[in-house]
C-alpha cells in the first residue's frame, strides 16, 4: 500500500504581516481563502501557520495579547479569530492545519514594539526569566514558570480549536548567558551536571510535556519540531536533543529538519545530510519530513562554499531534493519554507521554473 506523501507549507508571520495586517475584515478573509486555494491547487496537504511569533496570538487568547503581525499595535482587538478562520477554510479544502508556536521569542532585535502589561512577558522583564540580548528579547528555557506559561498556551489552543497539529520551530536556546543563574543553582544538587546536559534537559522537558498534552487531548493530533539541519548546532548552540527524539517514542511524531542546503554545499551537502537524519530515526513512531529552502531559489548561498552559485545556476533543486528523499526508510513527506517564496504572484522566472519542476513530480 502506498503511503500518502505529506506536503507541508509554512505560512509565517512575515506573510501574515504582508497580506493581512491592518486590512478590512472582508479583505483579510478573501486573502486567506485565496492563500488556501493556492496551497490546494499546488498540492499541499498541510499548512503550518505561525500563530505565536512574539509571545502573542493571532487568535482570541486569555494569556497572550493579539499579534502585531495582524493588528497595528500589540493587544489591539483582532477583527476576527484568524486561527479559527484558517482552520475552517483549510478543512473545507481538505488541508490539515498545524499551529506553529515560537516558544521562547518575545521580540526580535528588529522590533521596537513596547512590551506592555497585556503581554505575559511584562511582569518578568527585570527578572532572570527573560533576557534582552543582541538577537532580541527571550524567555528563559531553564525556568519552570516559563515552561508552564508555554504549555498553558498550547493547552489553550488544544482546548479551543480543531487543530491537526502543534509545531515548534528551531529557535530553541536563545543565548549563552540566559540561564547561568539557574545552572549554578542546579549544580548544587549535582556537581557533575554539565551546562550542555542542563540545557538539553530543559528543552527536552518542554518537548516531552508538549507531546503529552497533545496526546492527552487527542492522539491523532500531531506534534513535531523543525530543528536546524546541522545536527552539531542542535547540540552546541540550540541545545535540542534531536537524536533522542529520533530514537525514542514519546517526544515527537515527526522531525522536520531544516535541510536548507543544496547538493553541492561543502559543509552539509543535501543528500548526505538527509540520509544522516534518516539514520537517527530508529522508532517507527517518528517520521522524517525534510524542510526545504525554496527561499534560496535564485540566490547566492554565501556559506555553501562549492555550492555558492548552485541555487542561481539550477532550477530544479527542490524537485531533486524531494526525489532523493522519497526512498528513505522514515520519509513521510516534505515541507516548503515558505509560502511567499513559492506561491506569491510575483515570482522570478527562475522561482517559477523551480515551482513547475516541483509540481510535475507531485503528479506521480
PLM features per residue range, with description:
Residues 4-29, 98-99, 104-160, 305-309:
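Active-site-adjacent "subsite" loops/lids of carbohydrate-active enzymes
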Residues 30-57, 160-165, 248-254, 325-334:
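Catalytic domains of carbohydrate-active enzymes, especially glycoside hydrolases
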Residues 44-52, 79-131, 167-169:
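Glycine-rich, aromatic-flanked loop segments that form ligand/cofactor-binding clefts
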Amino acid at each position: 500500500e502506498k503511503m500518502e506523501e505529506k506536503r507541508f507549507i509554512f505560512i509565517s508571520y512575515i506573510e501574515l504581516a504582508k497580506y493581512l495586517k491592518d486590512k478590512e475584515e472582508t479583505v483579510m478573509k478573501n486573502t486567506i481563502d485565496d492563500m488556501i486555494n493556492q496551497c490546494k491547487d499546488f498540492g499541499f496537504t498541510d499548512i503550518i501557520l505561525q500563530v505565536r511569533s512574539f509571545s502573542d496570538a493571532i487568535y482570541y487568547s486569555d494569556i497572550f495579547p493579539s499579534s502585531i503581525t495582524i493588528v497595528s499595535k500589540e493587544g489591539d482587538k483582532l477583527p476576527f479569530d484568524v486561527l479559527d478562520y484558517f482552520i475552517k477554510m483549510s478543512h473545507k479544502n481538505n488541508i490539515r492545519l498545524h499551529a506553529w508556536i515560537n516558544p521562547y521569542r518575545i521580540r526580535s532585535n528588529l522590533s521596537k514594539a513596547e512590551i506592555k502589561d497585556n503581554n505575559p512577558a511584562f511582569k518578568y522583564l527585570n527578572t532572570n526569566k527573560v533576557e534582552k540580548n543582541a538577537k532580541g528579547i527571550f524567555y528563559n528555557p531553564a525556568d519552570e514558570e516559563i515552561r508552564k506559561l508555554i504549555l498553558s498556551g498550547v493547552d489553550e489552543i488544544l482546548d479551543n480549536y480543531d487543530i491537526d497539529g502543534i509545531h515548534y520551530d528551531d529557535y530553541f536556546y536563545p543565548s549563552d548567558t540566559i540561564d547561568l543563574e539557574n545552572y549554578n543553582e542546579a549544580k548544587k544538587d549535582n556537581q557533575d551536571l554539565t551546562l550542555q546536559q542542563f540545557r538539553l534537559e530543559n528543552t527536552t522537558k518542554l518537548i516531552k510535556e508538549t507531546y503529552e498534552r497533545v496526546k492527552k487531548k487527542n492522539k491523532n493530533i500531531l506534534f513535531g519540531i523543525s530543528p536546524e539541519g546541522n545536527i552539531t548546532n542542535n547540540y552546541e548552540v540550540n541545545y535540542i536533543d534531536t537524536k533522542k527524539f529520533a530514537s525514542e517514542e514519546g517526544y515527537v511524531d515527526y522531525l522536520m529538519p531544516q535541510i536548507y542546503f543544496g547538493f553541492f554545499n561543502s559543509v552539509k551537502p543535501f543528500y548526505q545530510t538527509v540520509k544522516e537524519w534518516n539514520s537517527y530515526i530508529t522508532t517507527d513512531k517518528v517520521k522524517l519530513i525534510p524542510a526545504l529552502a525554496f527561499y534560496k531559489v535564485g540566490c547566492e548561498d554565501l556559506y555553501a562554499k562549492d555550492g555558492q552559485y548552485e541555487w542561481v545556476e539550477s532550477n530544479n533543486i527542490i524537485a531533486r531534493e524531494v526525489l532523493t528523499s522519497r526512498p528513505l526508510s522514515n520519509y513521510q513527506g516534505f515541507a516548503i519554507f515558505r509560502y511567499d517564496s513559492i506561491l506569491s504572484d510575483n515570482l522570478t522566472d527562475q522561482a517559477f521554473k523551480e515551482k513547475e519542476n516541483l509540481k510535475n513530480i507531485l503528479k506521480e
